[in-house]
A protein has these predicted regions:
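N-terminal extension/subdomain marker
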Residues: 2-4, 35-36, 41-50, 64-245
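N-terminal targeting leaders characterized by basic, low-complexity, disordered sequences
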Residues: 1-40
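Hydrophobic alpha-helical membrane-insertion segments, chiefly the h-region
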Residues: 55-65
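Terminal, contiguous helix-loop blocks that mediate binding/assembly
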Residues: 74-139, 144, 242, 259-260, ...
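Residue-level signal for short, function-critical loop segments
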Residues: 157-158, 191, 255-257, 473-475
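Catalytic-core segments of thiol-dependent peptidases
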Residues: 190-289, 299-300, 305, 322-323
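Structural recognition of the beta-strand scaffold that forms the well-ordered cores
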Residues: 150-155, 184-189, 249-253, 293-297, ...
């Protein structure tokens, strides 16, 4: 695997003080705050930040909301008029003023060369594949000439609309399309507290038809059913089928997305209704009896192998994103106009237009952000992928069973991961297979590349080939849920068994490793660091036997993120207890060896190369001593090795700053391809009165980092799906930097904010490293191949 990857830094001077300039926020805010370095990932209770991507703050024309006059109980009905309707029965066109320009686009956009090196398998971006595998079924849609098309957009506006008007923006794009009479563009609206336009009702769910630049309300439903209830989706599709029959159907689901684990949707008006998982989505589209030209997700993270297989019997193509989507989302005007001018246009050409416009518009208005969108042939995927995936799963299970878990773990951690800080455990399937097999001609790789007919990404997204897959590593508590989903959607049983094998060995390594979420020992007066990971063989036997038998205490299970309801996967394995015990005993990081030598000159950590091979990541943590407790400065993946291969302590005591103000910074991800490295992290703030995270990116053209934008910081209990709502930082934005605050006993107490507001000026805020002058101590977090976290002894500033 090689050693973990750091990034460079250049210290620009001494920073401003943090101590004595702030006050407590009062309340826990967003996320999980039970550990030092709460945003770093890889610990036992990782902060479940809901990753999001770039949006532009929109000023929406306001006006009186439309009143709904004709609603019926329990169903959809025709609507005869509206107080906002014109004499022709159509609602007025919604519009917005010119979008504000953003600061810092030059720095954020000039990354054309970053991430261009793809590992092993050739870059498949921007190449339209018109071939069809001989075993693929016939397409459901066959052009006849003069085709009629019904496009169904299921638009759950949620907080994306309430806060940012994102759904309104896309409705405007639809009204600007030249829609012909043989295209029925139908939109179901709901799921949001406040629509940011004067047409769509915030009281009732509604159906609109968009034509001639206007929105005509067709039906409403004042019962406001949850849009994550599959029955609501079924009713919308049935309405469209019964009233706008066509020989070509297209379905787009608009909202948050959470990938294979969570599925689609978050209804802001029905927040306790959860999401619509893949099994429910599959059941809904199956129930309507329609065969679709394509099913698209204008939502995050839904381009998964599981999504594709679940829908392969009901649609010819899938259009979706592996990564989180920018708030700009799909750009609707052009492809709808193209479809109207030729309703028999090939889905390959139409899908290519959707993908190209999405990437190009994102590059224009969300520069510097990671974007992906792919067009997948479900007919071909159904014929080719299941057998090759089954073979890959058997081979991988064989590695795990034959003392090569570390090989699989290395491949998993090295693979392109999506929404990494959210711990949804989705990685690019092609990249995963290549990292494990080192063969670009592997049947699974070739079957996926064959099914992905068109794929594009932003230039900073390498190793994203069009379809991701769930592979557990960060959150073992989700394995049982995915096993259930796999059964419901008919996923390959060999893959299901393999991930349970992997999770079982990982859980065993975690319970034996006994890593620590926090460096509590080092900050409460015991400066010896972690002592876990040094159990005797007898201890290991006992721990593994208790874990696998289900007799381990609830407290011990909680230490590895599990409880008695989420350990079913432990019973589905081919490995004996003895095999597991022997492997873990021979492949573990003994944390007692994480001790500083040469402590009073340049402290260093010495491990053998075999021990370094057990380390998957290293992050530096800094705590400021406030006098009554500690201010947490976060986790940064900066570290250096000397000529002997020993890791050196940071004797400079430098930290990331924005315009010379040291800030709490949490490393999210590092992607390395050849000589190119891209590191992404977040800075928690209050942005214009709302919780948010500034996004910092280090890359080849910006080795000292730049501010790429900001994203909303959701509370972990709000939704498991992922929002598409990052924004550029613009002149006049008001920022207060916030830091987690802990007592001397290691207990999280509150968030500490700088009272002085930082107001963004005409030039982009500058990211740099500065010397920290406040009293501080540092420690390093080591994460091993089982995702255990260990901490070095603390080093106090002199």
């Amino acid at each position: 695997m090689g050693r973990p990857t750091s990034h460079g830094r250049e210290v620009t001077g001494t920073g401003r003080s943090v101590l004595g300039r702030g006050s407590f926020v009062g309340g826990s805010g967003g996320g999980n705050r039970n550990s030092y370095g709460r945003g770093g990932g890889g610990g036992r209770s990782p902060f479940s930040l809901l990753i999001v991507v770039v949006f532009v703050i929109i000023s929406i024309a306001t006006g009186k909301k439309s009143n709904i006059l004709s609603s019926i109980l329990g169903g959809l009905s025709s609507s005869t008029n509206s107080t906002n309707s014109t004499s022709s029965g159509t609602a007025p066109m919604i519009s917005i003023p010119t979008l504000p320009s953003s600061i810092g686009n030059t720095a954020a956009s000039s990354i054309s060369g970053v991430g261009s090196a793809w590992s092993g398998v050739a870059d498949n971006r921007g190449q339209l594949d018109t071939s069809v595998h001989e075993s693929a079924r016939e397409k459901f849609y066959r052009p006849t000439g003069g085709d009629s098309v019904t496009v169904m957009v299921y638009m759950c506006g949620t907080d994306l609309e309430t806060k940012h008007g994102m759904a309104t923006k896309d409705l405007i794009e639809m009204t600007k399309a030249n829609i012909s009479s043989n295209v029925n563009l139908l939109v179901y609206t709901g799921g949001t507290n406040t629509w940011q336009n004067s047409v769509v009702s915030s009281s009732n769910n509604e159906i609109y038809r968009i034509a001639d630049g206007k929105m005509n309300k067709l039906a409403d439903d004042n019962s406001n059913p949850s849009m994550t209830d599959p029955n609501t989706l079924v009713r919308f599709i049935d309405y469209c089928k019964n009233n706008f029959s066509a020989n070509r159907y297209q379905l787009i689901l608009w909202d948050h997305g959470g990938g294979s684990v969570t599925g689609y949707g978050y209804d802001e008006k029905n927040p306790n209704s959860g999401s619509m998982n893949l099994a429910k989505i599959k059941a809904a589209v199956a129930q309507t009896g329609i065969k679709y030209d394509f099913i698209g997700f204008d939502a995050c993270l839904m381009a998964t192998t599981e999504t594709a297989l679940a829908l392969s019997d009901y649609a010819d193509y899938l259009i979706a994103s592996e990564e989180t989507e920018p708030g700009t989302g799909w750009y609707y005007t052009n492809w709808l106009s193209n479809l109207s001018s030729n309703t028999a246009i090939s889905t390959l050409d139409l899908g290519k237009k959707i993908v190209d416009d999405f990437i190009d518009e994102s590059n224009r208005s969300a520069r510097g952000q990671s974007t992906t969108l792919s067009l997948v042939d479900l007919a071909e995927l159904k014929a080719t992928v299941p057998s090759s995936l089954s073979s890959f799963a058997r081979d991988t299970a064989s590695y795990i069973e034959n003392n090569e878990y570390s090989k699989v773990s290395y491949a998993r951690t090295a693979s392109r991961e999506f929404a990494k800080s959210s711990n949804i455990d989705q990685v690019d399937l092609v990249n995963l297979v290549y990292n494990l097999e080192q063969n670009e001609n592997d049947p699974t790789i070739q079957s996926i590349l064959g099914a992905v007919k068109y794929n594009r990404t932003s230039s900073n997204m390498s190793n994203s080939y069009g379809l991701s897959i769930y592979f557990p590593y960060k959150k073992l508590s989700k394995v049982d849920r995915m096993v259930q989903t796999y059964g419901d959607i008919g996923m390959d049983s060999e893959y299901t068994k393999m991930i349970q094998q992997f999770a079982t060995l990982q859980a065993s390594g975690q319970i034996v490793g006994g890593g620590e979420t926090t460096p509590a020992n080092t900050v409460t007066g015991n400066y010896q660091g972690s002592t876990s990971g040094s159990f005797s063989a007898a201890d290991i036997d006992s721990l593994i036997a208790s874990l696998i038998s289900g007799s381990l205490s609830s407290e011990s299970l909680a230490n590895i993120g599990l409880d008695t309801s989420s350990i079913g996967f432990l019973q589905n394995r081919n490995m004996s207890d003895e095999t597991i015990r022997n492997y873990v005993l021979s492949n573990r990081l003994d944390a007692s060896k994480l001790q500083w030598t040469d402590r009073y000159s340049t402290p260093k950590i010495h491990l053998s190369e075999e021990e370094w091979n057990m380390v998957s990541s290293i992050e530096e943590n800094m705590l400021l001593d406030e006098g009554s407790g500690y201010i947490d400065m976060g986790l940064d993946n900066f570290f250096e090795f000397d000529e002997n291969g020993d890791m050196l302590a940071d004797t400079q005591r430098a930290w990331i700053a924005i315009d010379q103000q040291p800030v709490a910074y949490y490393h999210l991800s590092t992607t390395k391809n050849g000589d190119e490295t891209v590191t992404i992290g977040r800075v928690p703030v209050i942005l214009n009165g709302d919780r948010a995270n500034l996004i910092i990116i280090f890359d080849g053209e910006h080795p000292n980092g730049y501010l790429a934008g900001a994203n909303t910081d959701y509370k972990a209990t709000q939704t498991e799906t992922i929002a598409k709502n990052i924004t550029d930082i613009v002149e006049g934005d008001r920022i207060q930097f916030i830091y987690a605050y802990y007592g001397y006993d290691g207990t999280y107490l509150d968030d500490y904010k700088l009272d002085e507001e930082y107001v963004v000026g005409k030039t982009a805020p500058k990211v740099s490293y500065v010397l920290v002058k406040d009293d501080n101590q540092i420690t390093y977090k080591f994460t091993d191949i089982y995702n255990n976290s260990y901490w070095t002894p603390a080093l106090k500033s002199k």
